Amino acid sequence: MSNTIKMVVGLGNPGKEYEQTRHNAGFWFLDELAWKWKASFKEEKKFFGEVARAALPDGDVWLLKPATFMNRSGQAIAALAQFYKIKPEEILVVHDELDIPCGRIKFKLGGGNGGHNGLKDIQAKLGTADYYRLRLGIDHPGDRNLVVGYVLNKPSTEHRRQIDDAVAKSLQAIPDILAGKWEEATRFLHSK
């Protein structure tokens, strides 16, 4: 049986100044997944990001950290997907989510972008919203005028611990996600 998911993308912004910011929660997840799978990232200019190939028993899975900045993530995803003939429904995008309490996780196929500029660009470049999303809650600052500063700053020690715990829990669901066991993955990820 082959993997249902062929590409896992972590969203974030490139550069040292952004490494520890909330908006890079997707990168944090992908770094942990690559470590778990013993996959190494290397910069691939034709894919506009850092790419790793995980050779798994049920087939290769590509890992991608776009280097295009969050708002242009779709460019990197579309380039890798087109080259390896990966369909949108075979892609899992992992990203931070303001509208979910810090440390909580949501998993779904498709849906709106919730104002997330990275998701807007992905939908525009793929031509569809029908890709899987693993949403890592980072909380909302309470005022929409504070959002940009909030996502581009480091979380508190407590919030970072909660996000790290969510990443660890999400990693446990990856085998079910890869196998297409959507209900099992959703039930596990949505539980407290």
UniProtKB/Swiss-Prot annotation:
Which parts of the sequence bind tRNA? Y18, F69, N71, N117
Compartments in which it is found = Cytoplasm
Report the EC number(s), separated by commas if there are several: 3.1.1.29
Query: What Gene Ontology cellular component terms go with this record?
Result: cytoplasm
Catalytic center at which residues?
H23 (proton acceptor)
GO BP field: protein quality control for misfolded or incompletely synthesized proteins; rescue of stalled ribosome
Keywords, comma-separated and alphabetical? Cytoplasm, Hydrolase, RNA-binding, tRNA-binding
Question: Which top-rank group of organisms is this from?
Answer: Bacteria
Q: Where is this site: Discriminates between blocked and unblocked aminoacyl-tRNA?
A: N13
One Gene Ontology MF term: peptidyl-tRNA hydrolase activity
Spell out the residues of the site Stabilizes the basic form of H active site to accept a proton.
Answer: D96
Alphabetized Pfam families for the sequence: Pept_tRNA_hydro
SUPFAM superfamilies, per database record: Peptidyl-tRNA hydrolase-like (SSF53178)
Q: Does the keyword RNA-binding apply?
A: yes
Chief location bin: cytoplasm
| Catalyzed reaction equations | an N-acyl-L-alpha-aminoacyl-tRNA + H2O = an N-acyl-L-amino acid + a tRNA + H(+)
Q: List the disulfide bonds.
A: none
Q: Which PANTHER family does the record match to this protein? A: PEPTIDYL-TRNA HYDROLASE
Describe the protein's quaternary organization and the partners it interacts with: Monomer.
Q: Which family does it belong to?
A: Belongs to the PTH family.
The protein's matches in HAMAP family, at most eight in alphabetical order, are given as: Pept_tRNA_hydro_bact
Q: What is this protein called?
A: Peptidyl-tRNA hydrolase
Native source species: Neisseria meningitidis serogroup C (strain 053442)
